[in-house]
């Protein structure tokens, strides 16, 4: 059994390290990995970041499951791509990843489903944002 962990941070290192304890595991690939994962005997760094190339790699290596750590590949739709190719992958779809990747989407989702959240407003033009600040004053948080 082979697994692929996508990411280069400490979270992915910890995840891959723990997954390496799985009985019957042949190999864990980490793409692209980091200096820490490079030192782990059970892990193999793979210098690939392109989603299509990662899917190709998963197919060629017959990876049983891919786990995605970072937000960016999720927001870019890597789960959708892998699933469209019949590959097993753990993580939210591009659409669901917006809860993490888009503050506006998350706030609107919470409002729509009556989930408590701070008041918010979203602007696409600077003048509208300034007018809102002038009307409501401080304290205010801008993101």
Predicted regions and their residues:
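Active-site nucleotide/adenylate-binding loops and adjacent lid/helix of ATP-dependent enzymes
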Residues: 4-5, 99-142
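ATP-binding N-terminal substructure of ATP-dependent carboxylate-amine bond-forming enzymes
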Residues: 1-95, 127
């Amino acid at each position: 059994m082979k697994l692929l962990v996508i990411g280069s941070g400490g979270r992915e290192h910890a995840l891959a390290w723990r997954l390496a304890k799985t009985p019957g595991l042949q190999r864990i690939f980490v793409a692209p990995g980091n200096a820490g994962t490079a030192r782990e005997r059970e892990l193999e760094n793979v210098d690939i970041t392109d989603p299509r190339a990662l899917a190709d790699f998963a197919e060629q290596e017959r990876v049983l499951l891919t786990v995605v750590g970072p937000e960016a590949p999720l927001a870019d739709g890597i789960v959708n791509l892998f699933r469209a190719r019949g590959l097993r992958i753990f993580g939210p779809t591009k659409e669901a990843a917006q809860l993490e990747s888009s503050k506006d989407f998350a706030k609107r989702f919470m409002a729509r489903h009556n989930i408590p959240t701070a008041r918010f407003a979203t602007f696409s033009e600077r003048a509208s944002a300034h007018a809102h600040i002038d009307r409501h004053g401080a304290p205010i948080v801008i993101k």
